[in-house]
């Protein structure tokens, strides 16, 4: 016979039960209710954690599904006037969900100005950023300017079409029929056709054969000018041999005229003849082997130990002749002989000189002081002839006791 469920309830609620039993039964019910509540809360928390962990994965999957992938893609970017600013062909293009960036593979592209191609680029990989305002190019990067034939290579390249600027942040190299160059970094302004080279710059001109070293260099390709505003070393080669070398704080080489303009702390050395020229400004023609200065100049022949200074001067390293004008002074360190004049003709490497205008000759042994209008002779061995010039001009000789 089935028991009535209500009878159990009546037993629990039976007032005939003892107080102790009633109290124990109440405690048991409270604990049971608390246990049920704790288990329910834990289950809910675990469910929420599971849901929260699954949400990012779901979002990532959704983002992945939103990415646009194009094969054999062509991307165009117009300027404000609607003209094509740049065009890129890529074997594969993967766009971000917001369509603001794209990852590219096997890239070829063109940069346009006024409807004409001014730069052709190639790279294995790249990224279009900032709605096409910046393009990063990597791996086997090459850029060519069809207007002048210059080719640029490097790593970690940033192309900013709106600024007409190409930045090569590592291992820059540039080549042109007239010049090759390398540097740590490089910048190319396509509107001005100007390269800026930064850090450990080396440049080699083909004709004449010149090798330049500096820390900062501008290469104006269209004008054929190479300009440095830092200390610059230039070596002239004949075959594999250095024939002349120069150093200056500022230098400009014209690749068209083959002339170098050197300024500030200029020092030029020649091996044949063995000569050193120091001045603040000099025009050096390596091909013609001439050096011209309109500033105070100092010429030293270390072989004969003869030094000449003047307000201006020019030296022909080919014919081995120096012409000095204005406040000329020649000194032989061997015997302390001195020759002063307005003009001086010096046949190098010998110490033979011809002087004109307000000539003064001095020697120490034997002591002698002679003045006149002209002088000729060998300064190193004190064999100098001083003349008065016209018949009414006298030579004054003072013998110092």
Where are these regions (language model features)?
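Mature-chain termini and adjacent capping regions
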Residues: 1-401
